[in-house]
């Protein structure tokens, strides 16, 4: 009987250890996510108040920064386990991501009550993100199986966005933004469940996933609100 008791005790100890490690992992992920949002906010602030003239004069500035942003993201995926380089790359990427939001933010700020529109989009994004995260953590429904379907929809949205660069249709842009808002809402459910189940290798991966979900949902909602307020 004592043998079974010892096995049970060891099993219980292992479960407690794993649960503790997962809790630390989740805590670190959300701390990095919050810090990433702060870095992006600083980037957007610098873009609006220090680099706005460069964005207004030429689109080249945006595309250069966008290329740097993508490069930093790939570098981060490659060096995700190498501290402190991974943190430098993470905050470099999110700061640069904030900079690339400058053209959109400037266009909204040029509208009547543009600041209020941005605040509304941010508030809606925050409430939606919090609500969806809580739902994902408590529901019995498994959203982690939706990865392939979500990725296919993402590819379609990217392709449609690239095509609309040529057509410049406001209706198509509104439709893309609406679908994107729904897509990234599901991505929040998907990524949150992957994080709480420990499916990411590092907290940085989880933080980047949540950051991209939040920012893309914010951009989608901001585009929708801008469309309605510019008519």
UniProtKB/Swiss-Prot annotation:
Keywords assigned: Cell membrane, Membrane, Transmembrane, Transmembrane helix
Q: What topology does the record note for this protein and the membrane?
A: Multi-pass membrane protein
Name the InterPro entries for this protein: Bax_inhibitor_1-related (IPR006214)
Q: Membrane spanning segments where?
A: 36-56, 58-78, 83-103, 143-163, 170-190
Q: What is its main location?
A: membrane
- What is its subcellular localisation? Cell membrane
Entries under CDD domains matching the protein: BI-1-like_bacterial
Which GO cellular component does the record give, naming just one?
A: plasma membrane
Q: Which domain of life is it from?
A: Bacteria
For the keyword Ligase, the answer is no
Q: Name one Pfam family in it.
A: Bax1-I
Q: Which PANTHER family match?
A: BAX INHIBITOR-RELATED, MODULATOR OF FTSH PROTEASE YCCA
The family annotation for this protein states: Belongs to the BI1 family.
Full protein name: Uncharacterized protein Cj0236c
């Amino acid at each position: 009987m004592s043998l079974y008791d010892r096995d049970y005790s060891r099993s219980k100890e292992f479960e407690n250890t794993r649960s503790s490690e997962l809790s630390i992992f989740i805590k670190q992920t959300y701390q990095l996510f919050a810090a990433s949002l702060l870095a992006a906010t600083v980037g957007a602030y610098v873009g609006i108040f220090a680099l706005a003239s460069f964005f207004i004069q030429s689109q080249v500035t945006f595309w250069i920064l966008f290329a740097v942003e993508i490069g930093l993201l790939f570098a981060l995926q490659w060096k995700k386990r190498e501290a402190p380089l991974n943190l430098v790359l993470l905050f470099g990427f999110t700061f640069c991501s904030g900079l690339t939001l400058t053209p959109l933010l400037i266009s909204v700020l040029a509208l009547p009550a543009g600041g209020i529109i941005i605040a509304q989009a941010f508030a809606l994004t925050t409430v939606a993100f919090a609500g969806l995260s809580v739902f994902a953590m408590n529901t019995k429904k498994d959203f982690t199986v939706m990865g392939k379907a979500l990725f296919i929809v993402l590819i379609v949205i990217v392709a449609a966005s690239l095509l609309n660069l040529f057509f410049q249709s406001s209706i198509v842009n509104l439709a893309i933004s609406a679908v994107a808002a729904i897509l990234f809402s599901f991505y929040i459910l998907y990524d949150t469940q992957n994080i709480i189940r420990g499916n990411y290798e590092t907290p940085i991966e989880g933080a980047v996933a949540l950051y991209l979900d939040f920012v893309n949902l914010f951009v989608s909602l901001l585009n929708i609100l801008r469309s309605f307020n510019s008519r």
